């Protein structure tokens, strides 16, 4: 179920503070965050935000199409390497 419009978008305060600081200083340095649950707001467009995937921070450039989505949607947390090969099938 989507979030109520009455409540507005959720963005962690510490992330929003870093976004405003980066805009004021025109910094191109990526903003590191662990907040995958934060929604992308129009203030973030053009910034690079490094979102944590459980192991490392993956840089993501914010575009207009991303507004309204959550940061975690753009960084994969699971790495699928395929099923193990069947040893019996290899011998034939």
Curated annotation (Swiss-Prot):
Presence of keyword Transmembrane: no
Gene Ontology molecular function terms on file: rRNA binding; structural constituent of ribosome
Annotated GO CC locations: cytoplasm; small ribosomal subunit
Keywords, sorted A to Z: Ribonucleoprotein, Ribosomal protein, RNA-binding, rRNA-binding
Pfam family, one: Ribosomal_S19
GO biological process: ribosomal small subunit assembly; translation
InterPro entries per UniProt: Ribosomal_uS19, Ribosomal_uS19_bac-type, Ribosomal_uS19_CS, Ribosomal_uS19_SF
Role this protein plays: Protein S19 forms a complex with S13 that binds strongly to the 16S ribosomal RNA.
Family the entry assigns: Belongs to the universal ribosomal protein uS19 family.
NCBIfam families: rpsS_bact (TIGR01050)
UniProt-recorded name of the protein: Small ribosomal subunit protein uS19
Organism listed in the record: Francisella tularensis subsp. holarctica (strain LVS)
Gene: rpsS
């Amino acid at each position: 179920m989507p979030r109520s419009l009455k409540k507005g978008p959720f963005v962690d305060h510490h992330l929003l503070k870093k976004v405003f600081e980066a805009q004021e200083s025109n910094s191109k340095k990526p903003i590191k965050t662990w907040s995958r649950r934060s929604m992308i707001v129009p203030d973030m467009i053009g910034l690079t935000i490094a979102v944590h995937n459980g192991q490392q921070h993956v840089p993501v450039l914010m575009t207009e199409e991303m507004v309204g989505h959550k940061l975690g949607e753009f960084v994969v947390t699971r790495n699928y390497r395929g099923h193990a090969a069947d040893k019996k099938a290899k011998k034939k």
